[in-house]
Amino acid sequence: MTANVLFPLFANLHDRAVLVVGGGKVAERKTEALLKVGALPIIGAPSLTASLQHWAETGRITWRQGTFENSWLQEDIWLVIAATDQPEVNHAAARAAHAQRLFVNVVDDIALSNVQVPAVVERGPLRIAISSGGGAPMVARYLRQQLESLIDDSWGRLTTLFAQRRDTIRARYPNIEARRRFFETQLTGPLQRLLRKQRHAEAEAVLEAALAETPPTGSGSVTLVGAGAGDAGLLTLNALRALNEADIILYDRLVSDTVLQVARRDAEQIEVGKSATGHSVRQEDIHSLMLQHARAGQRVVRLKGGDPFVFGRGGEELEFLRTHNIPYEVIPGITAALACAAYAGIPLTHRDHAQSLCLITAHCQSSLDTLDWAALAQERQTLAFYMGVAGLPTIQQRLCEAGRAETTPFALIENGARAQQRVLTGTLKTLAHTAQTYAVRPPALLILGEVTTLAEHLHWFGTAPLSAPCPPALIL
C-alpha cells in the first residue's frame, strides 16, 4: 500500500472553525463551499476579494488580516486550507498544521497535504465525491462533468424522501436484506419515474403505499423512446437511462444494432418492426404487448426510430395506454430529417434558400394522394420525404405537374447518420433515375430544395455526395 492512497471520508463541519489561508479567487471558492455546509470559515490574508470582503462585513466569515501566524491555529480549528499564490506561506501554514496534528489541504500541492478536497456532484443532500488523490485533478473534474449530465435533480429529491422516512423504513424492515430489497424496488420503480416528471405528491403517495404494503396495482409502465436515426451517440441522456432500466424493449425494424447494444443486457428485446412492403407486426399486436408487459409490472420501452411523434404512431400508442390506465412517458429523439441533414452537411433552413421546412410521409400511395402538391411546389421551402423510396417516381411526377422546377436540387440520403451513409444528389428531373441507378434501398430520406446544393462543400461525414449522370433521354 503506497503512502498516497487516501481513505474516502465525509466530514461534518457544521459550526466548526476552518482556517483558509489566502484571500484570492481560489480561497473564495473554497470558502463558498464551506459556507454551503454550515462551517465557520476564518480567512487569514492581507486583503480579500470583493465577495470575501462582503462576507466578512456581513458576519458570514471571520477575517484575520495579515500574513499567516501560528497563533491563528489556537482557535479550535478543525481543518486548514492553504490557498495562496505564495509557496512559502503555504509551507508555513502546512508545517504548523502538521505540528498540531490537524488536517490540512494545500491547493495543488500533494506533498504538503494530508487531505484532498474532491470534485463534487451535488443533488440536494446527495453528494458524490471524486478524487484522483491530488495527482490528476483534471481527470476528477472531467468525470464530475460527466456525472453532472447523467444524474438529474430527481435523485436529490429521492434522497430527501428516504431520509425523511429513515426511521419508518428501518422499523418496517428491520432485517437488512429485506430493507435492501425494498430500496432496490423503489430505486427502479414508479417512485423515481414520478419524481422525474415533477409529480412529487404522487411520488410520496407511492412511497407511503409501499411502506404500508399496499402498492398500487399495475405498477408497470411504458416509455416511448426516440432512438434517433442510427448513431447511438445521438441518443439523449434520458433515452440511455430508460434503456438501462428497461425490462422489455419493443423496438422498430429500423432501430440500429448500435442503439440496442447500449440497452440493459438482461432486458428482453422484441422486434415489432414494419416495412414499406408489408407489416410484419400489426399495430394492434404492439398495443397488446405493451399492455401485457406493463400489467405484469414490467418497465417497457417502446423504442422507435427517429422521434416517437414524427410519423412514429406515438400518439396512437399513448391514446391506447391512457385508455387502459397504463403510466407512460415520452422521451423525444432526433428525427431522421434533422439527423440525416446534419450528417450530410445540409442546413434545412437558410436565409438565402429556404424559410420553411415541411416534413412529409410517403410510405404508401394513399399518403401521396392526399398531399397538397400545389403547396409543396412553392419555392424557397425545403421538403423532407420520409419512407419514400418506393414512391420516388410519383413524387417526381406530381411535383413537376404542380409547377416545381425540374432543376430543383435534391439529396437522397441512404442509411443516414450510420457508417453506411450514402448521399446522392441531382435535380428533380433525375430523381427516379438516380434512385434506380444507385439501387437505393430503405432506410432513405429525400430532401428537396436549394439547401441541398450546400452538401457539396459542407459534407463532413462519410464519403462525398454522388451524382448519377443524366441519361440522354432526359436531356432536353
From Swiss-Prot:
> Which positions does UniProt annotate for S-adenosyl-L-methionine binding?
G305, G306, D307, V310, T335, A336, M387, G416
Query: Which superkingdom?
Result: Bacteria
Segments carrying the region annotation (Precorrin-2 dehydrogenase /sirohydrochlorin ferrochelatase) are 1-207
- Pathway(s) the chain acts in: Cofactor biosynthesis; adenosylcobalamin biosynthesis; precorrin-2 from uroporphyrinogen III: step 1/1; Cofactor biosynthesis; adenosylcobalamin biosynthesis; sirohydrochlorin from precorrin-2: step 1/1; Porphyrin-containing compound metabolism; siroheme biosynthesis; precorrin-2 from uroporphyrinogen III: step 1/1; Porphyrin-containing compound metabolism; siroheme biosynthesis; siroheme from sirohydrochlorin: step 1/1
Q: State the EC number(s).
A: 2.1.1.107, 1.3.1.76, 4.99.1.4
Catalytic residues per the record?
D252 (proton acceptor), K274 (proton donor)
Which GO annotations describe the biological process of this protein?
A: cobalamin biosynthetic process; methylation; siroheme biosynthetic process
Give one Pfam hit by family name. TP_methylase
Report residue spans for region: Uroporphyrinogen-III C-methyltransferase. 220-476
**Record-level Gene Ontology MF annotations:** NAD binding; precorrin-2 dehydrogenase activity; sirohydrochlorin ferrochelatase activity; uroporphyrin-III C-methyltransferase activity
Keywords of the record, alphabetical order, are: Cobalamin biosynthesis, Lyase, Methyltransferase, Multifunctional enzyme, NAD, Oxidoreductase, Phosphoprotein, Porphyrin biosynthesis, S-adenosyl-L-methionine, Transferase
Instruction: Give the family this protein belongs to, as stated in its UniProt record.
Output: In the N-terminal section; belongs to the precorrin-2 dehydrogenase / sirohydrochlorin ferrochelatase family. In the C-terminal section; belongs to the precorrin methyltransferase family.
Q: What biological function has been recorded for the protein in this entry?
A: Then it catalyzes the NAD-dependent ring dehydrogenation of precorrin-2 to yield sirohydrochlorin. Finally, it catalyzes the ferrochelation of sirohydrochlorin to yield siroheme.
Q: Could you identify this protein by its name?
A: Siroheme synthase
